[in-house]
């Protein structure tokens, strides 16, 4: 028997009714999303108890959990969930949706302790998303480096290693649309707006350069379905269109596959630090293990004087005697000798 059917329901005390049974506290005013009291003993036990939801799905093969809107979950509940997940499977992975720097986050007047141990293994990396998209659009490599190091300096290395790096999500405008559409489209037109060929190509160019950074920066690239096939879309809910079956952009798809192959082949290198080499007017190069990653968003060709073998290239890469030349809007990965 449900809580709205009877006050004798075992679930009644999980909710806060203001005018039973029709009015109750709900998430951001959405009546189909009633708030639950996560710290009510019966509810906490239902989710995190020995025979609760967490244990059930782990025993069915689930390997981890993403905590949606972590700011609105009490510390005590997150800690109980984390503890049960690790007791059920020590390798269970808990990741939280946190949009800001998770080490100094205040939510509802409370300083959160997501990364102090016992709550989360890592978080969604929205700060990197902002840094990447802004860099590709503005070409400001100095600001980009500052933003990256702000996170790297604050986060524990074990958290950084498994950050969820996305450039599009179910809550944001898709990267291709972000780069492609430059005019001010009104929200009421989001659903019917069709990108022109020029807008699509501009968006595609930006998407590929942003994806290069997504795959080469510290953390784990997390692809929002459809980005790898050329899907576009404005903010939620228009970013949630289905995968474009039969209409994939195979040039984009091959680009993602190539970067994914390199991530798999050089796993150890992508776990080894992040060392900037050169940062100048939209040109940025950095080292990951024995790999040198180079992106040139400037208006000028730049010499890349690094001995080694190019294992990935995008855009116009050329040679001048012994030097590689990174032309505008290009990127490459080199295995150094």
Where are the language model's segments positioned?
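Active-site-proximal helices and loops of the catalytic beta/alpha 8
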Residues: 53-55, 63-64, 68-163, 213, ...
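Aromatic/acidic polysaccharide-binding cleft in carbohydrate-active enzymes
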Residues: 109, 121-122, 164-195, 211-250
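Aromatic-anchored helix/helix-loop segment that forms the rim or "lid"
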Residues: 145, 149-151, 183-208, 265
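Short beta-strand segments
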Residues: 65-68, 95-97, 165-168, 224-225, ...
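Short, solvent-exposed loop/turn segments at secondary-structure junctions
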Residues: 58, 63, 71-74, 99-102, ...
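Carbohydrate-interacting/catalytic domains
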Residues: 203-204, 216-223, 227-337
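Substrate-binding/active-site clefts of carbohydrate-active enzymes
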Residues: 1-60, 81, 87
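The substrate-binding groove and active-site-proximal loops of carbohydrate-active enzymes
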Residues: 30-45, 62-72, 131-139, 191-202, ...
